[in-house]
């Protein structure tokens, strides 16, 4: 997961969040205009006279009148929709109120669409960040929350049931609640302030609901008034969803498992090759292992499961069409959500780039840091650029340090994910370690409510599945009860993935998932909050990011002292020496040797604190050109991907020249705010 840092005002190609004013307007369709023809311009040869038509009959007159009314209605309706859409845009200037503030807050949006929040108390800054996220990204927040809670079907209908079942099975909401419970009080206060800012704005009625809410018949104002539009636990859950999106390989494990019934191990590793120059991680004959266990479905079972899957897919496809008799046109986003869900567990080909250059190797004498994200395109953008400023907390907020941090935020999270403060800059790319393992769980033939667990040699032992029933509300249909089973390893994916029954005999075996990110001690959110206050690369990587859990990231950092550093931050499991599968394919869950044995200590994950680093490839320091932002003079040049180039022949002085040119251009433009807003607590 990575992104460009704070965009420079001098760069016209800055990758930033779409300005609210640039939201696409509804198209208009003016009537065709034909040029007038003067009688003198007509041809001299007149056409034969035509008989005059009879006066229109009653039905025809009625039809013409109705068409005129309908046509006018369409024009009026289109005008009403356009006016409503404009009314739903946020008010970005003037005065507004926000419940819960201890003092006034200033919000300024600059020409690069970076939102600057200046508060007198830290929690007010976080509350204001929640407000501006709600102002500009209300539907994005609402949709994200429905995804992680598995409530899409409530508004989109049965087409989204597979996604809801998968998310409910993973237990994202339950894991988020457990992780929230383990956070320290000051972190909980920040998450609460952020959620309060979102809910207060949505409940205020300061702007009309965006069209998505109207199309789906949703009432976010009432939900926000109860504090339920966004909760502190939702921020923890959204961090989990990012870990799910960027850190998984269960799909690849299942693909190897499925392929092993048709090809031998040598061919299997040709289909799923290891890293170049490396041997396969496991030498186990997977085909022989799974045949000996008898896990695969018979042809009859596979055909039956495939037929059921095809019927379900056809139903979902039909429900997803733009057909008013079957579903709402607004259900079109579900197709992309289903594609996203189908792609979970496959991270090959995903990646990013970051570079950091020590001050001693740059012409300016200051370090350079660039971050190039390789995340999918979306509308609205996944990132929201912001700067949060506040002195240290006073009175009831005395536990909170001051803020001056700038960079890319994620709507739903109350901190800068990638960016810089007055002392240090940082960037991420995805490390992609193996933090997910699938386990074959054998079902007790005498009691299907039990599964096999490790036992002394020569003995067999069983344990009960942990179960819970999830009720999924479905638009236009009765509620669906979904039973979630879990083993000592984790949730049973086979209960939510129809493809499993097409490959394996699910009456005798199921697949359970062990995923590091679901553990209750996942405090990635805490790392993000504490990173904003780091004063050096050592504090960032050695203190704040010790809390970082999932998804593991290659973190590069630079500070005002000229130091640069790299650290693989995150939690990676250790496996026993006799674990011959090494996590590449589903393992027999009743054999203890396949269980995780612990975690790689944070001090032992890869790191470096010297020289010039590049996460994709080593390069000469002079190959990076940077545009520095005049907004914060930290001595650390934070480079946006759009303004960074790599050319081997580039002279060493190019970086300083580019900085000088960028600074001059920014001064010429004046770094003027495009919108100013003053927020205060209601009287």
Give residue spans per PLM region.
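N-terminal Lys/Arg-rich, disordered targeting/topogenic segments
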Residues: 2-59
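N-terminal Sec-pathway targeting helices
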Residues: 54-72
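Substrate-recognition/specificity elements adjacent to catalytic centers across diverse enzyme folds
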Residues: 67, 75-368, 373, 379, ...
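Short helix/loop capping segments that flank catalytic or ligand/cofactor-binding pockets
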Residues: 118, 126-127, 238-240, 365-366, ...
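Glycine- and acidic
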Residues: 177-184, 368, 520-530, 683
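Compact, glycine/acidic-enriched structural inserts
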Residues: 398-480, 531, 590
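Hydrophobic alpha-helical segments
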Residues: 436, 493, 547-683
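Alpha/propeptide regions of enzymes that mature by internal proteolysis
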Residues: 524-546
């Amino acid at each position: 997961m990575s992104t460009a840092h704070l965009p420079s005002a001098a760069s016209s190609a800055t990758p930033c969040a779409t300005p609210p004013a640039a939201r696409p307007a509804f198209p208009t369709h003016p009537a065709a205009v034909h040029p007038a023809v003067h009688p003198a311009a007509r041809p001299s040869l007149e056409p034969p006279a035509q008989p005059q038509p009879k006066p229109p009959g009653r039905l025809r007159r009625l039809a013409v009148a109705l068409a005129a009314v309908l046509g006018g209605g369409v024009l009026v309706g289109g005008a009403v929709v356009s006016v409503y859409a404009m009314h739903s845009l946020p008010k970005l200037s003037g005065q507004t109120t926000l419940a819960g503030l201890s003092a006034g807050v200033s919000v300024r949006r600059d020409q690069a669409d970076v939102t600057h929040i200046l508060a007198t108390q830290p929690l007010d800054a976080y509350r204001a960040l929640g407000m501006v996220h709600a102002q500009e990204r209300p539907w994005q927040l609402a949709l994200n929350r429905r995804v992680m809670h598995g409530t899409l079907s409530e508004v989109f209908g049965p087409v989204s049931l597979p996604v809801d079942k998968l998310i409910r099975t993973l237990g994202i909401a339950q894991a988020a609640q457990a992780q929230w419970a383990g956070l320290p009080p000051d972190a909980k206060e920040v998450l609460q302030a952020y959620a309060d800012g979102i809910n207060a704005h949505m409940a205020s009625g300061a702007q009309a609901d965006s069209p998505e809410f109207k199309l789906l018949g949703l009432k976010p104002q009432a939900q926000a008034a109860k504090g339920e539009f966004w909760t502190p636990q939702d921020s923890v859950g959204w961090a989990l969803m990012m870990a799910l999106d960027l850190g998984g390989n269960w799909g690849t494990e299942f693909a190897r498992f499925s392929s092993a019934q048709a090809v031998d191990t040598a061919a299997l590793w040709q289909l799923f090759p290891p890293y170049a120059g490396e041997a396969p991680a496991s030498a186990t004959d997977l085909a022989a292992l799974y045949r000996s266990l008898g896990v695969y479905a018979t042809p009859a079972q596979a055909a039956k499961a495939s037929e059921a899957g095809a019927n379900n897919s056809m139903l979902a496809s039909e429900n997803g069409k733009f057909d008013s008799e079957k579903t709402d046109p607004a259900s079109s986003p579900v197709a992309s959500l289903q594609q996203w869900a189908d792609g979970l567990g496959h991270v090959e080909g995903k990646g990013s780039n970051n570079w950091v250059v020590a001050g001693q190797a740059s012409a300016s004498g200051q370090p350079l840091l660039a971050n190039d994200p390789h995340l999918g395109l979306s509308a609205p953008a996944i990132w929201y650029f912001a700067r949060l400023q506040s002195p240290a907390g006073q009175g009831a907020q005395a536990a909170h340090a001051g803020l001056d941090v700038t960079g890319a935020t994620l709507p739903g999270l109350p901190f800068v994910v990638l960016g810089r403060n007055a002392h240090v800059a940082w960037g991420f790319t995805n490390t992609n370690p193996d933090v997910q393992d699938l386990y074959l769980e054998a079902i007790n033939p005498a009691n299907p409510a039990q599964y096999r667990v490790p036992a002394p040699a020569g003995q067999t032992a069983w344990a009960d599945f942990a179960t819970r029933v999830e009720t999924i509300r479905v638009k236009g249909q009765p509620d669906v009860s979904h039973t979630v089973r879990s083993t000592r390893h984790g949730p049973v994916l086979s209960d939510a993935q129809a493809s499993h029954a097409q490959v394996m005999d699910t009456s005798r075996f199921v697949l359970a998932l062990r995923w590091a990110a679901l553990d209750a001690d996942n405090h990635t959110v805490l790392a993000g909050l504490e990173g904003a206050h780091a004063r050096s690369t050592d504090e960032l990587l050695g203190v704040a990011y010790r809390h970082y859990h999932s998804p593991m990231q290659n973190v590069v950092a630079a500070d005002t002292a000229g130091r640069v550093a790299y650290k693989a931050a995150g939690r990676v499991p250790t496996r026993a020496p006799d674990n011959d599968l090494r996590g590449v394919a589903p393992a027999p869950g009743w054999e203890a040797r396949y269980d995780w044995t612990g975690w790689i200590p944070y001090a032992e994950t890869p790191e470096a604190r010297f020289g010039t680093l590049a996460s994709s490839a080593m390069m000469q320091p002079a190959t990076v050109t940077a545009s520095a932002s005049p907004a914060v003079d930290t001595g650390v040049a934070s480079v946006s991907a759009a303004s960074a180039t790599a050319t081997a022949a580039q002279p060493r002085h190019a970086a300083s020249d580019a900085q000088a040119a960028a600074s001059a251009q920014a001064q010429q433009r004046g770094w003027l705010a495009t919108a100013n807003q003053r927020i205060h607590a209601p009287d």
